[in-house]
Amino acid sequence: MRRSKSYEVRDPINIWNKYDFAMSGLGKKSKILAKIKHFFKCVKWSKQRITRGYCDCDVWEMFSFLQTLIPDMLQTLKDTRTGSPGYLGENYTNENGILVNDTCHEEWNCILDKMIFLWREAEKDTCSQKNPFDEAHSKAMDEFTERFGLFGNELQTEKELEENRKRGGGGTIHFMDELPEYKEISDKYREEEKRLEEYRRKCKDEAIDMIKQYFYDLWD
């Protein structure tokens, strides 16, 4: 599975992605000025990528950057390589009496495919397993927000409002699962998210184990 190129999903590899440009103007008085400033940051980061191989924004979310970069590089290695590790496959004598080993290529392909798959499964946006309750949970959240506000403001009690006034402002946050009509979908969604997080963590661990095993073979 290739990583998404959609507008909603941030692409950590592409410094000039549309998502970051859109977010740069969020909450700013002048969105145009904010986007211009972000443009010059992108120029700076591009120069850093050229001179040292990574830029400042890569470090901010290093795990996400590597989770995207590594499978992309593995895919390129698989697609463009000219050889395979010679210790893979089996040696045999061909019809001309020459000892050869061309079965290593298929075995190396399978190994690379598995590494690519595991790295992509370890990243939420490219993972093949999705939360089946995501749509229902989002719909319930939209309904909750419309009825009670983003942070459940309308559910605040008189006592909470009074305590907040004494503190000088602020508010008490109320969550969707506090209400009986939303508790079931909230619990189902949360439990599935825990399962998916554990699945992605296992994929990450297995992917790293394979990188350790074949680390010195990752060249062409």
Regions found by a protein language model. Give the residues of each.
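Long, non-globular targeting/processing and low-complexity regions
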Residues: 1-214
